[in-house]
Structures are given as C-alpha cells and as structure tokens.
Amino acid sequence: MKQFLMAMVAMTFVPAMALSQDKTDQMKITVHAGDTALSATLDDTAAAQDFASMLPLTLTLEDYHGIEKVADLGRKLDASDNPDSYAPKAGDITQYAPWKNIAIFVAPFQASRGLVRLGEFDGDFSTLSRSGPIEVRIERAD
C-alpha cells in the first residue's frame, strides 16, 4: 500500500514537470525595430526550430492589407509537425509557406491553409503596427 501511495504521489508531479520542461524548450528571441527591442517566444516545433537556425536575420517588413507585416525568407521552413492551416491572432509570428515569407500579424485573421505558427510576442509589439516598411533584426535572446 505504501508503494502504491508513493507511486500515486510521483505521478501527480510528472505532468507538472512536463509543463515546466515545455516552457524551457521554447526559445526566446528579440526583434529589434530601431531603438525598440521586442521580446517573443518561439514554439517548440520543427518550423520554429528551423526558423531559429536562420538567426540572426535582418529583414524589411512590409505592410500587407493592414493585417500583417511580411518579408521574404527565401525558403519554406520544415512544417512537418504543424497543422495544414492556422487562424492567427494579433502578435503571432508565422510563415506563409506558399510564398516563403514571414508574416507578423498585427490583427487577427481567419484560418489560412499554408500558414505555419512559429511563435508570438510576449508583450506590446505596437512598434510594428505603424504604416510603411520597418527594418528589423531578429536574434536569439541572451
């Protein structure tokens, strides 16, 4: 009976340990826009890891229909473990695979086939909402 109780207690901690492990697997990045540094977290997916392998990157983000800022990445990321479509929310960092671009959503949008979530901003990202092109440098956080 004592062994059974000890096993039950141990099993209650396994999910909590798994959750804390998931958080440490997520990579923190910094998006620099002028003098502003924006914190973001990449998901623990093949696509996000593939994107992280390209860092640091300097990109010019362009407006796209007032909903997102986009820039060409030059290649598709490994989306083997992602769903076929995704409905983004404001602050999501994604790749639209058919066009091989990064898309940072400044407003929510409907589910789109080929949209792959990479991560999200940790807080205010309104610097990226301004009109016109914005040069950014994306790098792993220290």
Regions found by a protein language model. Give the residues of each.
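Well-ordered alpha/beta subsegment
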Residues: D25, G119-D142
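Bacterial N-terminal signal peptides
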Residues: A7-P15
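Positively charged n-region of N-terminal signal peptides that target proteins for export
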Residues: M1-F4
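Short, surface-exposed secondary-structure edge patches
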Residues: P83-A87
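Loop/turn positions that initiate beta-strands
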Residues: A90-D92
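Boundary at the C-terminal end of the N-terminal hydrophobic targeting segment
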Residues: A18-S20
